[in-house]
Amino acid sequence: MPRPGQPRPSSGPPRLGPWERPTELCLETNDERSQPPPGRRTRRPDPKDPGHHGPESITFISGSAEPANEPPTCCLLWRPWGWDWCRAAFCFRRCRDCLQRCGACVRSCSPCLSAGDPIEGSSEAAWAKEHNGVPPSPDRAPPSRRDGQKLKTSMGSSFSYPDVKLKGIPVYPYRHATSPVPDADSCCKEPLADPPPTRHSLPSTFTSSPRGSEEYYSFHESDLDLPEMGSGSMSSREIDVLIFKKLTELFSVHQIDELAKCTSDTVFLEKTSKISDLISSITQDYHLDEQDAEGRLVRGIIRISTRKSRSRPQTSEGRSARSTAPAAAPDSGHETMVGSGLSQDELTVQISQETTADAIARKLRPYGAPGYPASQDSSFQGTDTDSSGAPLLQVYC
C-alpha cells in the first residue's frame, strides 16, 4: 500500500528524470552477439624489417571497405573504437603478407591494398634513412644493394664504378665468364673495340706479325727471333742478314762507323749515292716500302758499328785489288797502314822499315825518341844545315 501523498506506481517501467536517463539504451535484438571491446593489441615487427625496433600498435585504415547503411545510434558496434576494430579485422587478412615483408601496414593499409608487392625503391629509401641517428646496417640492405656490393667486391677495391666509359668504351668490361652478367640498362655490356694495327711499314700483302713489337729492334743477332712476315716470303731475320752482307760489301767498317754518326740527320741520305741505290734495291728485292727499307738499313748500320768484336768478311774484290797492287817503295808507314785496311776488328798489324827520313823527323821533335839527351835539344846536331845561333825573330822596340 502506498502511503498517502505518494504517487501511485504504474504497471510499466518506472520513469526516470532527465538526469537519471542512461546514455545508451537499445531495445533491438541482433543475431550477432555484441563482443566486448578488445584491448589494445600490439605486434612485434618482423626481424627482417630494418625500420622498426620496437612493438607498434596496429591501426588500420580501410581502403576497400564498403560503406554500410546508417546503423541505429544505440548499437555499441558502431562506436568509433568499434569501427576501428572492424576495419582492422577486414584489413588484417590482406595486409598480413605486407606486414611480414615491408612493415608499411602498421601505419597505413593503403600501400598493400593498391599493390600486392612492395616497391623496390621504397625499400631502398627506407633502408637509406638513419634510425635514431644510427647509420643503416649493410647486413639488412635490400637485395639490389647487396648485389651491387657483391659486384664491387668482385671488381676489387681500387675500382668501384663499373659504368665508367672512356671515349665510349667501358673502362671495366666483362671479359671473364665468372663475372656477373650486367643488366639491360648497364653500359658495361659493350665489348672493347679492337685497337687498330700499329704496324705501317709492311704492305697489305703480308700478314701482320703476332708479336707486334718489331719496331723495337734488338741490336743483338741472338734476339732476331722474329716470325715470318708471310707464307712463302723471307723472314725478317733473313732480310736483315742480307742487308748486313750488302753493307759490308759496299762500305768498310770505318765508313759504316761514320755513317752511324749521321743516321739521325738528313745528311745520311745525302752522304753518297750508294745509300740511295741500296735503299731502292732493298725496296724492289724484298717488296718493302721505302720507309721500312731505310729503317732496316739504319738498324743494320748501327748494329755493325756497335759490334766491334765481329770480323769483317773479306770480299773477292778486296782480295783481287790487294793482290794486283804494285809493290810500293818503303815509306814512313802511313800509306802502308792505310793500304792494308787496318781496322779495330783485325788483330794483325804491319809495320814498315825505318828510313833515314824517319830518323831525321824523330830527331827534329824535342823529346821525340826515348832516351834522347836533353843537351841536344837546342843544338840540333846531326842535321844537314848549320845554325848561327841568331834568333829567328827580332823584336823592335
Swiss-Prot record:
Its main location: cytoplasm. One of its GO terms (biological process) is keratinocyte development. Residues 44-55 have a biased composition (Basic and acidic residues). The modification Phosphoserine is found at residue 218. Residues 201-211, 375-388 have a biased composition (Polar residues). GO terms for cellular component: anchoring junction; cell cortex; cell junction; cell leading edge; cytoplasm. Residues 321-330 have a biased composition (Low complexity). Keywords: Cell junction, Cytoplasm, Developmental protein, Differentiation, Phosphoprotein. Residues 1-16 have a biased composition (Pro residues). Residues 1-67, 124-158, 191-214, 304-339, 361-392 are annotated as: Disordered. It holds the Pfam family DUF4656. It is found in: Cytoplasm; Cell junction. Plays a role in the regulation of the epidermis formation during early development. Required both as an inhibitor of basal cell proliferation and a promoter of differentiation of basal progenitor cell progeny. This is Keratinocyte differentiation factor 1. It comes from Rattus norvegicus.
